[in-house]
C-alpha cells in the first residue's frame, strides 16, 4: 500500500522539507509515503476564492492514484488517537488500495474534494500552519505504523 500526501502549496521552508523527509525515509518499502504538491492559486485583494478552491481541488483529485481511498484532513473529520490511527492503517492495508490524504490550502479543501472522500481525519481542533501539518501527518502515520509492527518508536 502506498500513502500519497497531496498538499496545496509549494516552495516550503527548508525545515518543513527536512522534517517531512526524516519521517518519509523511515517508512518501509511496502508502505512508501509520497508527497505531491499542488500549486496554490494566487490570492489577492480581488481573488475569486471559490474559483481558486475549485481549481486546487481539481488538481488535487487529478493527482490521486486510480482506485485510491481518499481521506481529507478537515476540521469536521474524525479525531483519532494513535491506537485508533494504527487500526485505520491496518484497515487500509487490508483493503488493498492505496491511500491519498488531501491537505487543502489556507481556505481548506474544495467541496469536490470533500465529496470524493471516503473518510475525513481531523488532525487537531487547533489551527496549524499548513507546512507544519505535513510533518505532523508524516510523524503520526509513522508512529501508527510502528505501533502495528511492535517497533519500539511508540511507547504507551
Curated annotation (Swiss-Prot):
Keywords: Cytoplasm, Methyltransferase, rRNA processing, S-adenosyl-L-methionine, Transferase. The keyword Disulfide bond does not apply. GO terms for cellular component: cytoplasm. It catalyses: pseudouridine(1915) in 23S rRNA + S-adenosyl-L-methionine = N(3)-methylpseudouridine(1915) in 23S rRNA + S-adenosyl-L-homocysteine + H(+). The keyword Transmembrane does not apply. Homodimer. Specifically methylates the pseudouridine at position 1915 (m3Psi1915) in 23S rRNA. HAMAP family: 23SrRNA_methyltr_H. This is Ribosomal RNA large subunit methyltransferase H. It comes from Tolumonas auensis (strain DSM 9187 / NBRC 110442 / TA 4). The gene is rlmH.
Amino acid at each position: 500500500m502506498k500513502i500519497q500526501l497531496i498538499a496545496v502549496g509549494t516552495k516550503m521552508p527548508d525545515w518543513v522539507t527536512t522534517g517531512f523527509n526524516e519521517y518519509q525515509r523511515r517508512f518501509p518499502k511496502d508502505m512508501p509515503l509520497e508527497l505531491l504538491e499542488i500549486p496554490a492559486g494566487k490570492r489577492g485583494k480581488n481573488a475569486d476564492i471559490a474559483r481558486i478552491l475549485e481549481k486546487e481541488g481539481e488538481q488535487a483529485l487529478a493527482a490521486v492514484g486510480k482506485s485510491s481511498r481518499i481521506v481529507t484532513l478537515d476540521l469536521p473529520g474524525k479525531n483519532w488517537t494513535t491506537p485508533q490511527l494504527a487500526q485505520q492503517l491496518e484497515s487500509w492495508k487490508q483493503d488493498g488500495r492505496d491511500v491519498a490524504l488531501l491537505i487543502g490550502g489556507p481556505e481548506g479543501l474544495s467541496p469536490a474534494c470533500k465529496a470524493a472522500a471516503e473518510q475525513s481525519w481531523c488532525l487537531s481542533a487547533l489551527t496549524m500552519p499548513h507546512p507544519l501539518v505535513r510533518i505532523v501527518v508524516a510523524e503520526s502515520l509513522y508512529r501508527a505504523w510502528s505501533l502495528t509492527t511492535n517497533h519500539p518508536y511508540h511507547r504507551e
